[in-house]
């Protein structure tokens, strides 16, 4: 009975991932969106309002650099620039589009900011850090086939990853809290952390590098791998979940 449940879980997760990736906006011709004209231009979109968080969506590629200077630049086909929306909402820099875009040369957003408290990405979009981010507390969120690549050194890092999305984390932290579900992949084996709390479910995979303690919970065909044996470890495996040293 358990094997049957695991099998159906994996089938559902794979179907979900296929649906998500087929619906993500990318450099693919679907026929319903706007085509770029091939004439690439760059615009300065630095807002007047302050922000410490970023939310990126709808297939856009964004890089973020921690810097004393504040700037936002958008590079894209000239006729697509007006459809790339940059605004600040309650301290969050929101990056999105108001139209679907099919065939284009590039759609890049470059952000520089001094304080970074949260990075969020969904709907096939991506965020990558240029340098090592530092601070007290950092929240990371990825969803719906998106990608988040972050190098950071914070006291506390809290990351959640779902619906076929991918996170690759590196750096250092005192406390690391991770949650992955619905066929997502959270790679944090290059992020050294004193205390790690990791939860993985529904066919997801998590990798970690705990130094002092690890509290791990894996269920429904999901896995958690740890690359270092911590001084304290607590494992909770259920419904085909696995927790192993790699």
Language-model region placement:
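Intrinsically disordered, low-complexity terminal regions
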Residues: 1-181, 185-246
């Amino acid at each position: 009975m358990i094997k049957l449940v695991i099998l159906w879980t994996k089938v559902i997760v794979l179907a979900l991932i296929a649906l998500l990736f087929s619906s993500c906006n990318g450099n693919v011709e679907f026929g319903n969106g706007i085509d770029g004209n091939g004439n690439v231009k760059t615009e300065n979109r630095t807002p007047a309002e302050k922000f410490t968080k970023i939310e990126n969506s709808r297939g856009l590629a964004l890089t973020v650099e921690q810097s004393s200077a504040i700037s936002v630049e958008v590079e894209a086909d000239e006729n697509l620039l007006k459809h790339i929306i940059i605004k600040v909402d309650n301290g969050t820099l929101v990056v999105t589009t108001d139209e679907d875009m099919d065939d284009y040369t590039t759609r890049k957003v470059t952000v520089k900011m001094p304080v970074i408290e949260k990075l969020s990405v969904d709907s096939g979009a991506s965020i990558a850090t240029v340098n090592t981010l530092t601070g007290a507390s950092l929240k990371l969120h990825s969803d719906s086939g998106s990608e988040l690549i972050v190098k950071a050194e914070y006291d506390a890092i809290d990351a959640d990853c779902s619906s076929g999305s991918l996170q690759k984390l590196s750096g250092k932290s005192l406390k690391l809290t991770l949650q992955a579900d619905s066929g997502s992949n959270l790679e944090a084996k290059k992020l050294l952390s004193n205390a790690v709390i990791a939860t993985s479910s529904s066919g997801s995979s998590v990798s970690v590098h705990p130094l002092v303690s690890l509290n791990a919970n894996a269920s429904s065909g999901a896995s958690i791998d740890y690359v270092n044996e911590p001084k304290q470890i607590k494992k909770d495996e259920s419904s085909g979940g696995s927790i192993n040293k790699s």
